């Protein structure tokens, strides 16, 4: 029996999940979990990438302690951030977080030189200041000139483990630098940044064998002999693979620090309507596209908890929130002011004050406000998606950590007026494992993998119901105008 390890690292935590296929069912075991985050060093918010590598080795040593001497391994992480590699293969600096303030106004500055419509037609990717395109636009020229290669985070981890440099396509598409038509890094865009296309590794599809873990790591650490497979390395791409969907008329919501809501399509949509609504066409596994909108997610709730010194668990916060009427206050969760404020609680209160709403005071009121606002935003985006794609959405599959928030799931079902299916919460790691198993011949296809997922995990169901959607939508429109 083959053993598979998913290295799944998000913006706030990481984990190593051991998986195996037994009687057409996936069995998972969490082997190691660790915290992740950025710290302010050398003038920027930076990821502790060396510490992440150490945590991976600690996790693999725990796998070996289970008596497993050989395994298959795949890596997924958050998107857009990168590591600059020098001529000798060394890391030139710790990677800067997408939440760093260096890209403020970068979209405006670059698009004043290079029209938005032109960039969108080429790439089909939504405009966000965190995109790699804008990070490289403001990157230190000296570092860029010294860099032989630019590797996104999961590709860098794979490189450290195996010595092989690739640019996996699902994650590379989030950079806003891939040409949809040519299926390559766009030389024209890169030349505008004075970056040679050769600084990027060869584009590689999800499901491709990468290589074996280097001997030096086997000698330094007591870890299994691992075959590394390049999975869908963008965590959302893996989460969509791990979605237990069936049929055609469905949408997905990968709910975590970010909310990524969209549809899986066979072809991109980069027309005027998609451009106007700032939708993105991220590449998916096995020739698919993730037509989606990137929305703020549970980050806001996480920050409320932090400002409260974690006196309440997230379950307790949701319980407190249920004591208040919904939609008493509505915030635009995608407003840039909520991206990384000094104090999230103060920012929410100030927003409500500025927009003529009552100010939420308690932890329950604040949480109620955020969950209600998120659900409303999801419903509005599903409505827009239907208009742009012409496809009727009958079901929404919510996966990731947010699938455990029953209040948010039920509010979404009611506002959107469709059935909501919630779970599994570890869809990203599951999608990571499924791609590995397809590579190894244990699972036939992504469709077959999704059937196995449905048979392996409990999926929650939330029915739609009557709610004052149009009235609430009108109130939200007025809030936006006020703001």
Swiss-Prot record:
GO terms for molecular function: ATP binding; glycerol kinase activity; rhamnulokinase activity. Its EC number is 2.7.1.5. ATP binds at residues 11-15, 257, 302, 401. It catalyses: L-rhamnulose + ATP = L-rhamnulose 1-phosphate + ADP + H(+). Keywords: ATP-binding, Disulfide bond, Kinase, Magnesium, Nucleotide-binding, Rhamnose metabolism, Transferase. GO terms for biological process: glycerol metabolic process; rhamnose catabolic process. This is Rhamnulokinase. It comes from Listeria monocytogenes serotype 4b (strain F2365).
